[in-house]
Design a protein with these regions (language model features):
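Short glycine-aspartate micro-motif
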Residues: 4-10, 96-100, 171-176, 285
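N-terminal phosphate-binding loop and adjacent alpha-helix
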Residues: 30-94
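Glycine/GP-enriched mid-protein hinge/lid loop-to-helix segment characteristic of carbohydrate kinases
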Residues: 3-5, 17-59, 135, 143-146, ...
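Glycine-rich phosphate-binding loop and adjoining helix at the ATP-binding site
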Residues: 73, 77-81, 94-171, 294
Length: 294
């Protein structure tokens, strides 16, 4: 029996997860390692006060294909690359046949870089930098071929993982994420790429009545910033928000109520997609970290 040893790397806005899987020929998982986590703030040089370039500026630069990446943004994206490399190095004692890598944000046309990033630094040359580091510093005769969308990867995880909740499901909505939001649609057993449908906006593109995006209203980063903007984003800060809301603190209660409205709006937006095709989702799956937030 031939086996494939695949290292999966899941980059996010605040950290990187990596895990080694062993597959049979039919893509059935037969074994897996424990998850390794590397936070960006563990890497020397990380800038806790870094603020992403405004989205309207990012969109204009993508449209004109003229990216003005500041030194601060380059430095912060370098921290991300180092964290990803650390995540790969952790598993070099094991056999690795293939590498798979997903990351949030809008990708470059060739899926080799990040052109828009709502919760972090852009890096149009991310794949090139990673592959150069893999060859030079690790010595693996393997390259990353593309950057997969984190939202699509989340849905695929639910479809193919032994414990996945979307096995044998034709139509479903997935909403997950951590610092940001990752959501996806499974339609007629096919994974929908939101970027390929003009009428399907991502959570950071859907505007609430208060002028904020859905992601700003219900993600970990968004909730923390609304609660105490100057403090580092953390689960502890989120728990403090929930505790104050349970005590009827007015500002905390308003933030939580708006988060619930944002969640409902996102569900309504995704339901409208199915209604347009006279179908109805069999399941709505909430990711583990998003479930904790909700």
């Amino acid at each position: 029996m031939n086996e494939k040893h695949i290292l999966g790397i899941d980059g996010g806005a605040s950290k990187v997860f990596s895990q080694l899987y062993i597959f049979k020929d039919n893509n059935t998982v037969i074994d897996q390692s424990d998850t390794y986590e590397c936070r960006y703030d563990e890497i020397n040089g990380h800038d806790q006060s870094f603020s992403p370039v405004p989205l309207n500026v990012q969109k204009n630069e993508m449209k004109d294909n003229t990216y003005k990446i500041s030194n601060d943004e380059k430095m912060q994206s370098g921290i991300v690359v180092k964290a990803i490399m650390k995540s790969i190095e952790y598993f070099t004692k094991d056999k690795i046949d293939h590498l798979g890598f997903c990351f949030p944000g809008i990708k470059m046309k060739e899926k080799d870089g990040i052109s828009i990033m709502a919760n972090g630094p852009r890096n149009p040359y991310m794949l090139k930098e990673l592959n150069e580091n893999i060859a030079k510093n690790i010595g693996l005769n393997i390259i990353l071929k593309k950057i997969y969308d984190d939202s699509l990867s989340c849905v695929n995880g639910e479809r193919f993982s032994p414990k996945g909740k979307l096995k044998e499901i034709s139509d479903a909505i997935y909403i997950g994420g951590g610092t940001g939001i990752a959501d996806g649609i499974l339609y007629n057993k096919k994974l929908i790429d939101l970027s390929m449908y003009k009428n399907l906006k991502k959570s950071w593109e859907i505007i609430m009545p208060n002028g904020d995006t859905i992601e700003e209203c219900m993600s970990l980063a968004g909730l923390c910033k609304k609660w105490k903007k100057r403090k580092p984003i953390s689960i502890d800060l989120l728990n403090d928000l929930f505790d104050k809301a349970s005590e009827k603190h007015e500002m905390a209660s308003d933030i939580i109520e708006t988060a619930g409205q944002a969640f409902q709006l996102l569900i309504d937006e995704r339901m409208n997609f199915f209604k347009a095709y006279n179908r109805f989702p069999e399941k709505i799956i909430i990711g583990q970290r998003m479930g904790k937030i909700l």
